Structure formats: C-alpha cells, structure tokens
Amino acid sequence: MGANQLVVLNVYDMYWMNEYTSSIGIGVFHSGIEVYGREFAYGGHPYPFSGIFEISPGNASELGETFKFKEAVVLGSTDFLEDDIEKIVEELGKEYKGNAYHLMHKNCNHFSSALSEILCGKEIPRWINRLAYFSSCIPFLQSCLPKEWLTPAALQSSVSQELQDELEEAEDAAASASAASTAAGSRPGRHTKL
C-alpha cells in the first residue's frame, strides 16, 4: 500500500452511563487510531512494557463487554508507510508503558492524540478526553472507576502473551544454564557428598 492513508479516530462509549451523561457533555470514552486497516490504542497494566495494543478497527467486542462503538472521526491523512507507523508505535510504546497509565495525565485518549499529531499533525477533538479534565478537578474519581476501564480485554490478552513470551525465554535460559551446570558438574572432585 502507498502513502496518503486516512487517519481515523475510533471512539467507544465505555459504559452504559454514557447514555445519560453524554447529553450534558460528560462522557467516558476510549479511543484508538485507525490507519492502514489497523487500530492502535493504549491501556494500563501493572508491567513496565508497552501498553499499546492493536484491535480490529471499530471492534468494541475485542475491548470488552463494557465498551460500545460510538463513532469514527476522520482526522486527516498521513504519508507515512505502514512500516514507518509500526516503528512510530513501537517508539511511542517506550513512553506509553502499561504501568505509566494515568486517568488524568496519560490515558488512551492522550495516546490517540499523540499518535494523531505525529501522523497527520492534528489533535483529537477535546470532548473525547473531557473526563481527564474533570477527574483532575475531582481527584478521587479515578479510585471510583471499575478496574476493567483501565485495562481493556484486548490489552489483557496482549499482556498475557507478553508475559508468556517472557516466561518461555526465562525457562529456556534456565534450561541452558542447567545443561551447562550439569556438563560442568560431571567433572570429578566438583561436588562434596554429605
């Protein structure tokens, strides 16, 4: 595929409560950036690696049952190639680690805005991240939110895979060390019998 790809912001209602609060301009929204038929988003988890994950564009079911697709907003277009975007997302992952997630200062909407600014030079609409502003005025609000709002189901799957990969690497390293130890231990005089 070539350049000049649309950059789309996919917005999701995060809870049934939005049916009541969105009419007065206060909503709880998740967002992700869609480009090249892929959607990138960010969520929190307790580990020091990237909290950025990928879902099928507009597929709220991959995020979990508390999410409902709301709308797609075309933000502009980008001349970056798909490979470039993967590198950009990987670099952003160094800043947007799972354990760096914060409802007011570094949430999914902050990530979407940062990626959008890089890709097409445009921030996301302010209404999407209004909750962050209000929660900065009412600090205890974050502790009142359900935990699943902070870690969408798609991210939980991504985190599980990352942890599984790390576990397999550790097991391989332990097996190699054990084999080396066994080989070194087969020399006479190396062990003392009790």
From Swiss-Prot:
InterPro entries under this entry?
Answer: PPPDE_dom, PPPDE_sf
Q: Which UniProt keywords apply?
A: Cytoplasm, Hydrolase, Protease, Ubl conjugation pathway
For this chain, one GO molecular function annotation is: K63-linked deubiquitinase activity
* Entries under Pfam families matching the protein: Peptidase_C97
GO cellular component terms, A-Z: cytoplasm
* Gene3D superfamilies in UniProt: PPPDE domains
PROSITE patterns hit by this protein: PPPDE
- Which residues does the entry assign to the active site, renumbered to this chain? H30, C108
Query: Where in the sequence does UniProt note compositional bias of the Low complexity kind?
Result: 173-184
Query: Where's the PPPDE domain?
Result: 5-149
Q: What is its EC number?
A: 3.4.19.12, 3.1.2.22
Compartment list: Cytoplasm
Residue numbers spanned by region Disordered: 162-194
What catalytic activity does the UniProt entry give for this protein? Answer: Thiol-dependent hydrolysis of ester, thioester, amide, peptide and isopeptide bonds formed by the C-terminal Gly of ubiquitin (a 76-residue protein attached to proteins as an intracellular targeting signal); S-hexadecanoyl-L-cysteinyl-[protein] + H2O = L-cysteinyl-[protein] + hexadecanoate + H(+)
Top-level lineage group: Eukaryota
Hydrolase among keywords: yes
Q: An example of a Gene Ontology BP annotation on this entry?
A: protein deubiquitination
Q: What residue spans carry the Acidic residues bias annotation?
A: 163-172
Its job: Has deubiquitinating activity towards 'Lys-48'- and 'Lys-63'-linked polyubiquitin chains. Deubiquitinates 'Lys-48'-linked polyubiquitination of RPS7 leading to its stabilization. Exhibits palmitoyl protein thioesterase (S-depalmitoylation) activity towards synthetic substrates 4-methylumbelliferyl-6-S-palmitoyl-beta-D-glucopyranoside and S-depalmitoylation probe 5 (DPP-5).
**Subunit structure as annotated in this protein's UniProt entry:** Interacts with RPS7.
Q: Which family does it belong to?
A: Belongs to the DeSI family.
**What is the protein name given in its UniProt record?**
Deubiquitinase DESI2
Q: Which organism is it from?
A: Pongo abelii (Sumatran orangutan)
Instruction: Provide the gene name from the record.
Output: DESI2
